[in-house]
């Protein structure tokens, strides 16, 4: 009888834990465990205006071969977005119709983007292929993080704005 009580308790605890996690996801909260932005709890805030350069946003990556490879390499975590990946937090660096040049760093409409060195290899020595750059297509965003090893539009290119979930607002965060 004692074993059954313990199993019921553990099952109930697990259900409560999962329920709390699901409620947080539905409630617009996300846990950031990547160094691209401060670690901790973030909230997704609905965007009631057009997205702007400098906005820190959550977005769901599109289901593309580039993101399939990113998931295989461990650049993106598993999550609830289409394709089974977690939403990413990035800063909007360029909007549709802006020209992005990608060489050893990023230049947007003739102006260098700070903290935008383009790496040739990742932390494990694997080749990183930069996006070729060009004009950001309609309904797309070029996203960036100032974290040197960030996986962002330097490598995956502009993303459809349909994947935009909202503004990223820190709730309880810290820099490692």
Swiss-Prot record:
Location in or out of the cell: Periplasm
Protein name per UniProt: Conjugal transfer protein TraF
Top-level taxonomy: Bacteria, Pseudomonadati, Pseudomonadota, Alphaproteobacteria, Hyphomicrobiales
GO molecular function: serine-type endopeptidase activity
Keywords assigned: Conjugation, Periplasm, Plasmid, Signal
Purpose of the protein: Involved in conjugal transfer of the plasmid.
Organism: Rhizobium radiobacter
Superkingdom as given in the UniProt entry: Bacteria
Family note: Belongs to the peptidase S26C family.
GO BP, sorted A to Z: signal peptide processing
Entry's Gene Ontology cellular component terms: periplasmic space
Predominant location: periplasm
């Amino acid at each position: 009888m004692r074993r059954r009580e313990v199993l019921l308790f553990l099952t109930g605890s697990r259900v409560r834990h999962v329920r709390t996690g699901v409620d947080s996801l539905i409630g617009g909260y996300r846990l950031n465990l990547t160094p691209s932005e401060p670690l901790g709890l973030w909230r997704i805030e609905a965007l009631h205006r057009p997205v702007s350069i400098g906005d820190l946003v959550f977005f769901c990556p599109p289901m593309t071969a580039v993101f399939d490879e990113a998931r295989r390499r461990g650049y993106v975590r598993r999550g609830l977005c289409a394709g089974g990946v977690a939403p990413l937090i990035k800063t909007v660096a360029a909007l549709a119709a802006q020209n992005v040049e990608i060489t050893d760093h990023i230049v947007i409409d003739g102006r260098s983007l700070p903290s935008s060195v383009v790496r040739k290899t990742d932390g494990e020595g694997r080749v990183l292929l930069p996006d070729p750059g060009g004009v950001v297509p309609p309904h797309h965003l070029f996203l960036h993080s100032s974290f040197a090893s960030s996986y962002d539009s330097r490598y995956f290119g502009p993303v459809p704005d349909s994947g935009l979930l909202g503004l990223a607002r820190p709730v309880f965060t810290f820099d490692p």
